[in-house]
Amino acid sequence: MKVLGVVVEYNPFHNGHLYHLKSAKKLVKPDFTIAVMSGNFCQRGEPAIVNKFARAKMALLNGIDVVLEIPTVYALQDAGGFAFGSVGLMHKLGLVTDIVFGSESADISFLEKISKILYENSKEFDYLIKRELKKGLSYPNARKFALQKFLKTDLDTIKKLENSNDILGIEYIKAIFKYNSNIKYHVIKRVGAKYNEQNLSGKFSSATAIRNAIKFEKNIKEYVPESTYLILKDEFEKGRGPVFLENLEQFILSEFRLKARENLENIYGFSEGLDKRFIDSANISTNLKEFIENIKAKRFTFSRIRRLIFHAIFNFEKNYMEFSNKLGPQYARVLGFTTKGQEFLSYAKKKSTIPIITNPSLKNKILKDVLKNSERKWDFNISLYNWQFEKDILASNIYTLFYPNSSQRKSGMDFRKPIIIEG
């Protein structure tokens, strides 16, 4: 049995995603296709434009059989943490045979070579990165120059690593090595606009450009499948979107005005005096843009700052985050499936080394049931299972506060049933 896995955000699902999915299926010829998808918050440290159930529906209507949620504690990390959580989810299901990712270079041998070097020489490479960071460089630039020195190669070769999808590709392969997984990896050449292209540019426009167009009320119909367009239209009409970081500007500023430095000392990622920068900035800034720009320094990227905003709001304690980055995801949360996907889930429940959660209300019962099966070699920690799950619930409850329509802002989104699509 061949099972294709793709790591996605679908924020929102657009023509480029459909091209990637069709190409991946053509390459692998799978019996089932699953997507592991960011929930209500995405890797760049921003809320998704519509909620995770709406985006799961987009995926199911366009060829995905099962959508699983990447736990929030991984979805809001840098490329390495994001990949470790995403690949871990697929690996622990025990059935995924192939992963396909998009890449600007599409040079799988180069990506594999870099991944292997970084995996096998992580301590030496980390030392070089720290040395570059001390020069005041941002992490991406420090990583680039450290790699150039480590490989003793020219900067033009290393420039490939400035592409976001190539960086993620390297981290996916590294994660496969870390888990000692048998998952095969493949690459597809990315088509159309760059990942972070701000403006609409032809049929294959970036998700960033599409979100910007939505913000400025431009027509996006030609850049997304019809099903995506209709789902977005329905969510917007009901006041459940579009959701942007600015929607919760006052909430974010008040959160950091209420905090003291000691509140941030135990939060994952708050090092190098960032705790003071956040507190000071909250007190002198009048809006979110000012807040982020006042924190920004040469070595801190905007994405890192945005992620840290939510690390603090969701209370991502260092010890639990480090534990998470050692053990990987502790459960597989199902957001939706097709009737074909239901067949896959029946197989997965027999092979998975982590609990599969289709109904969050039954989380504790599911835990008791899996622990009764002592013959299976389980790969999760009960304390971490509960902690990661609680962060997903909290993230959803905060996310609904971003909704334009106040009547839609109730908590408890996660306790709905998963989406089931016929066919």
Swiss-Prot record:
GO process annotations (BP): tRNA modification
UniProt GO MF annotations: ATP binding; ligase activity, forming carbon-nitrogen bonds; tRNA binding
Swiss-Prot/TrEMBL catalytic activity: cytidine(34) in elongator tRNA(Met) + acetate + ATP = N(4)-acetylcytidine(34) in elongator tRNA(Met) + AMP + diphosphate
Pfam families attached to this UniProt entry: HIGH_NTase1 (PF05636)
Protein location: Cytoplasm
GO CC terms: cytoplasm
SUPFAM superfamilies found in the cross-reference section: Nucleotidylyl transferase
Superkingdom of source: Bacteria
This protein's UniProt keywords: ATP-binding, Cytoplasm, Ligase, Nucleotide-binding, RNA-binding, tRNA processing, tRNA-binding
Residue sites binding ATP per the record: 7-20, 102, 165, 190
Top EC class, one word: ligase
Record EC number: 6.3.4.-
Similarity comment: family membership: Belongs to the TmcAL family.
Summary of the function given for this chain in its UniProt record: Catalyzes the formation of N(4)-acetylcytidine (ac(4)C) at the wobble position of elongator tRNA(Met), using acetate and ATP as substrates. First activates an acetate ion to form acetyladenylate (Ac-AMP) and then transfers the acetyl group to tRNA to form ac(4)C34.
Full protein name: tRNA(Met) cytidine acetate ligase
Gene name in the database record: tmcAL
